[in-house]
Every structure is written in structure tokens, then in C-alpha cells.
Amino acid sequence: YHKTKDESSVGIVHLSDIHFNELIDIQSNKYDFNIASKRLFLLAERAKTYFHALGVTEILIAMTGDLMNSDRRLDEMLNAASNRTKATFLAVDILQQFILDLNKDFNITIAYVSGNESRVNPEIGWNDNIVSDSYDTMIFYILKKVFEKSKGIYFIEGDCSELTICINGVNILMMHGHGCINGSVEKSIEQVKGRYASHGVIIDYVIFGHIHSAI
């Protein structure tokens, strides 16, 4: 546990579309569990440098889906490092080390929503029982169990399709993005914010994945 220096300063680490278990080995691109682990280590190092410079002691790790790669198509099955059951525990181990690394310097809160590629069943559904049948959900709750006695590590449970979090008066919406982010990203986001505004909820910031691009 780390004493909070400035309650108004909260850092956000966004994890999305990691696609654990995907295996890529071509001249222009390579990806496997080892590379994923190295990338997360580098992300942790850069995050610590940035957050320390801003006096941050509290971090939100926002996981917005597709932590696990799909295996529904033949090319995905042929380009998998392992099966998804074994891959789940490898993913948990890598994320556990990532969280522990950051927790050396910061208090951490972890929240998640489910993606589309990491779902267990082939069909996409929007019912909570269907959406939560996901490797994203499984990884989140395994991590929650792993850290249940840890100090300075907290978990937020909620709607695994879209989750709103209020941080120091700022309403943040977490979502994966499939089904609503398409065409013009800016227009799609404004439509989502408008949907919430019609119910009296003003969204200040939207965190999402799915499109595999930084904007």
C-alpha cells in the first residue's frame, strides 16, 4: 500500500487487444507470449517514469477486452501458441507480474470489459450471461483471486459490456467497441456519449479497443 500524495492525480494504464496466444512469425512481424511479456515490461517501465514525474500514486488498469486471441477460424487455430485453456494461465502469469511491478510504486485498481474475439462461444450476444462467458472475464476473476489478500490492489466489478467509472468527478466509459465503433470513430463516440446523456449521464472520456489503432 502506498500513501496517496495527490488525490486529484490518477494514472490510467490501458490494456486492450493483447491477443495472448496469437503466434506470428513472419519477416515483418513476430508475436508470442515472450514478446507480449517484454512489451508489458516496457509499458510498466515507461508508465512508472511518466507517473512519477506527475506525482501519481493511484493507477487504474483499464482492460478493454480481447486479452485472448480467437480460435474460431482455421487460420487462428493454426497460428496459436497453445490451446486457450493453457494460454489463460500463461496470460494470468504475465499480467500478474505486470501488476506486481506497478504495485511496487503505486496503488492499483483494476477494471475490465469483455471483447469479441475472447468470447468462449462462437456467437456474439449482448445478454450479460453471454457476454461474461469470456476469457476476459476468466482472466479478471483469476487475477482477483490471486490478489485477494494483497495490499494496494483493488478490483472493480460491474457491467462487462460497458462500464462507467467516476474518477475525481470525471466520468470514464470503458467499452471494447465492437458493435458501436465503426466508420468515423469520432462520430461513433459522440453517438455513444449521446446515448448516455439521454439517460442523464455525462461521459467525459471513453476508453475502448477493438480497432487496433491509437487515435
Task: Give, region by region, the residue ranges found by the protein language model.
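Extended recognition/assembly regions associated with phosphoester-bond processing machinery
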Residues: 1-215
